[in-house]
């Protein structure tokens, strides 16, 4: 009897949603930016694979901003740089919000994950907490640990280049475990706590993809007994994991054995920050979620680009030889004198952006753009893949060309920007730490090695995972030492 009643209410709810959807679509269609036609009732079908590539194709057809409709959801996809500035930067106050993400946020993350936290008091206190530990001055204090782990990455590649992807993941995991929880010993990607966190992140990458779960289009499904019950179970497992990690730091603090860390800061200031135990656990775990997989993927893209574009690699190495030489390793203090390295990093971000599809925003007011009206409640996606292929700013976009970031004096251009870390008030709070990681790993890798492809196993530069944050599929590299006694030079500088 209960199931019959539930089914009846489900049908009624779906019918109501469909009728409301039809009325809404007729009212809004005239004012929205154009887009591909869809079913008169259900709208468009979400792309099954690599949505950011399909959205980039639609940008070529319909222009800088186009509209999709998924049931009652209206989605505007932004695929050009100036349109992104006009909508997501100039209207930052009206686009700080996130759309309701029932599967990924409410069910999988129990509403605690900062990535999908809507605008409001929780987001404000989350960002206040992050600001203290990730602002530029705080990020600079992590440089010594980043430097030493980057040197270990080079030594790992020297001794076992076949596992270069694993070495990049180890670097990223070691740094974020230090920042997040104060762990000072080298971290392996195979460590149990790292594997558990990465399992959670893998689940998120699948759930957050557009169209992955019908409940995001028809919210009533959330209340159907048994629907996607595994998401609730995964959410409980994830919260338990982050709680265990935070509690371990609590015990260290009680014994006066804790290293400085983000988790320790949150615990010591929990009352002042107004954080519940669950919020604190999720927030401390967010450091790993935001910084591990993304940093490792970007390092992999850096080595891929170096191998596939040897002339570009050689240009960076010429400057490294001039500024640094071979008697010592490059350091953060050399950054100002190494614009070729910085340009290489900026091009890595643009060429293969890890968060290629961007994270959706939600408008809280009507936004007028180029005569169109993007109504309140619209989901707005800044498609980083398409924006990085804006022909007005990035001609020959598929070419990896760091020189596009340099002016006639060989310095980094002030007039060219790429929003790899997001837009407006939702920009990634860990951007400064990420920039530091990419700079020092790029400088050390190109100083130490000539990186090349294996002729028997050419690299497919489009072979990436189909996940929310993309990463290269396994590929083979050769690491030929450029510096005599690399190990001795590096170990002489290891702290």
Swiss-Prot record:
Similarity section: Belongs to the cytochrome P450 family.
EC id: 1.-.-.-
Binding-site residues for heme, renumbered to this chain: 428
PROSITE patterns xref list: CYTOCHROME_P450
Swiss-Prot/TrEMBL cofactor(s): heme
Biochemical pathway: Secondary metabolite biosynthesis
One Pfam family named in its UniProt record: p450
UniProt entry tagged with the keyword Oxidoreductase: yes
CDD domains in UniProt: CYP64-like
Protein name per the record: Cytochrome P450 monooxygenase 113
Cited Gene3D superfamilies: Cytochrome P450
Species classification: Eukaryota, Fungi, Dikarya, Basidiomycota, Agaricomycotina
SUPFAM superfamilies: Cytochrome P450
Keywords: Heme, Iron, Membrane, Metal-binding, Monooxygenase, Oxidoreductase, Transmembrane, Transmembrane helix
GO cellular component entries: membrane
Chief site of localization: membrane
Function in brief: Cytochrome P450 monooxygenase that is able to use 4-ethoxybenzoic acid as a substrate for oxidation.
Transmembrane segments: 2-22
Record carries keyword Transcription: no
């Amino acid at each position: 009897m209960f199931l019959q009643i539930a089914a009846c209410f489900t049908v009624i709810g779906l019918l109501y949603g469909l009728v409301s959807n039809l009325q809404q679509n007729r009212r809004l269609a005239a004012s929205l930016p154009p887009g591909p036609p869809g079913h008169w009732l259900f709208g468009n079908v979400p792309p099954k694979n690599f949505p950011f590539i399909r959205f980039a194709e639609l940008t070529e057809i319909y222009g800088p901003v186009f509209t999709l409709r998924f049931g009652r959801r209206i989605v505007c996809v932004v695929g050009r740089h100036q349109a992104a500035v006009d909508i997501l930067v100039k209207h930052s106050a009206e686009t700080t919000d996130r759309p309701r993400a029932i599967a990924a946020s409410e069910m999988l993350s129990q509403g605690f994950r900062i990535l999908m936290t809507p605008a409001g008091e929780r987001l404000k206190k989350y960002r206040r907490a992050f600001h203290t530990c990730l602002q530029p001055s705080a990020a600079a204090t992590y440089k010594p640990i980043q430097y030493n782990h980057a040197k270990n990455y080079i030594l790992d590649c020297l001794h076992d280049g076949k596992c270069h992807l694993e070495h990049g993941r180890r670097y990223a995991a070691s740094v974020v475990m230090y920042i997040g929880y104060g762990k000072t010993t080298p971290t392996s990607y195979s460590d149990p706590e790292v594997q558990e966190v990465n399992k959670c992140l893998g689940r998120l990458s699948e759930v957050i993809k557009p169209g992955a779960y019908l409940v995001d289009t028809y919210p009533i499904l959330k209340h159907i007994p048994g629907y996607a019950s595994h998401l609730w179970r995964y959410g409980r497992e994830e919260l338990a994991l982050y709680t265990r990690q935070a509690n371990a730091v609590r015990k260290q603090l009680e014994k006066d054995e804790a290293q400085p860390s983000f988790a320790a800061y949150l615990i010591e200031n929990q009352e002042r920050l107004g954080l519940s135990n669950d919020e604190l656990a999720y927030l401390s775990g967010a450091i790993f979620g935001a910084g591990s997989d993304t940093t490792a993927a970007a390092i992999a893209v850096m080595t891929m680009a170096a191998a596939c574009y040897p002339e570009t690699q050689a240009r960076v190495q010429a400057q490294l030889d001039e500024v640094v030489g071979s008697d010592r390793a490059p350091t953060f203090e050399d950054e100002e004198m190494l614009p070729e390295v910085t340009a290489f990093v900026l091009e890595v971000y643009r060429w293969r952006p890890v968060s290629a599809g961007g994270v959706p925003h939600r408008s809280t007011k009507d936004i007028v753009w180029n005569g169109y009206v993007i109504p309140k409640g619209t989901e707005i996606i800044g498609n980083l893949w398409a924006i990085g292929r804006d022909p007005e700013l990035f001609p020959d976009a598929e070419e990896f060309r760091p020189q596009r970031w340099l002016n006639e004096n060989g310095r980094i251009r002030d007039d060219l920007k790429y929003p790899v870390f997001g837009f407006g008030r939702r920009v990634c709070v860990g951007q400064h730490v990420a920039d530091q990681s990419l700079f020092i790993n790029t400088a050390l890798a190109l100083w130490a090695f000539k990186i090349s492809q294996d002729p028997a196993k050419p690299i497919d530069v489009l072979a990436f995972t189909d996940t929310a944050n993309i990463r290269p599929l396994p590929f083979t590299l050769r690491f030929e030492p450029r510096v005599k006694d690399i190990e001795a030079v590096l170990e002489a500088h290891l702290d």
